[in-house]
Amino acid sequence: MMREVQILLVVISCVIASACLEEGIEEAFDLSPPELVSWEAVSEEEILITFTEEVKASPDDFFLPQGKTLTSLTVEGEDLRLTISPPSLPGEPLPLEGRVRDRVGNSLTFFLVVYGYNERVPEVLINEFTTQGSSSHPDCVELYLVTEGNIGGLVFYEGTDTDWDQMFVFPPLDLPAGSFVILHTKPDGIPGEIDETTDPAASGGKDSHPSAWDFWLPDGKGLSGNNGVLTLYTRPGGRLLDAVVYSTGTSERYEGFAQKKVLDRVREVEDLGGWKGASSPLTPDDCIDPDPSTATRSICRASVPQDTDTKEDWHIVTTGGATFGGPNSDEVYTP
């Protein structure tokens, strides 16, 4: 019996030694640093950063802008929680530089921007847009607030959150339901083009509206004329709020969407449930046809917007019928 016990102990010792050896070999050949998975503000003061593996860090590893202080740091496996003071405003950009290490000492230095926590995200629709702008009426996108809230941190993409040509993050701004916001996507770059956060009549510039809130896309080039995806998210890396897909369907390339990037974006929005059609996967026939539109024949929803995430929500108004900053026209252009 004693001999059997001795043999069992030897076997257990060998198993433990083997496991330790394998772990040691694994650590010896682990040369990869942790990678960022996600980051977001989870409250006005707390930031959550997630990595691909367990990490270690100390307060001295982080650098914040002047006026911001790191008051606490908590490491929970792959998650890192930072408490920042004073609290950030909704959508306020916070540049953050930091460094973390894994259990064998591989380190990652990173720089990212976290947008202030917004607990009052409104329901917002992309409500009107033009893709065939002119020198006197450049391309614009209008947003309509279905409910009241703060648009701080909301982000518009020409594209999607993972692949885009142009983007704009809105600053903190409390607005009532029924408000209109205009994003001018091809500004002239003149001093009068002011992002309005206190006075809706403050901005000049082409097609600015005295009672809507005007914003100007820096270095904006306008929108793609024939094929494109427009999206609105709660924040960079956040939840999809609204999407629009348009295509003339005249191209023979990439299933009618002309470019691979557009096709990929269409598929991404479809997977998120942001756009629907009779076909699956979506084809250009399921999308808005922008071909009859012009700089003043905008593509818009009804005056009382409907949102079924289909092309049936949309029409092209008659010539001169664009109404950026006010209720949409229900007149329909007939070629």
What does each model-found stretch correspond to?
Residues M1-L8:
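Bacterial N-terminal signal peptides that target proteins for export
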Residues E78-L82, V181:
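Short strand-edge motifs at loop-to-beta-strand transitions and within beta-strands
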Residues P87-P90, P172, A177-P335:
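Solvent-exposed beta-edge/loop recognition patches
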Residues I16-A19:
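C-terminal motif of bacterial Sec signal peptides marking the signal peptidase cleavage site
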Residues L21-D30, E40-V42, S107-W164, D219-N226, ...:
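A structural motif detector for short, solvent-exposed N-terminal "entry" segments of globular domains
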Residues T52-S72, L154:
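Short, surface-exposed alpha-helix to beta-strand junction/turn motifs within ectodomains of secreted
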Residues V100-N106:
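Short, solvent-exposed loop/turn segments at the edges of extracellular beta-sandwich modules
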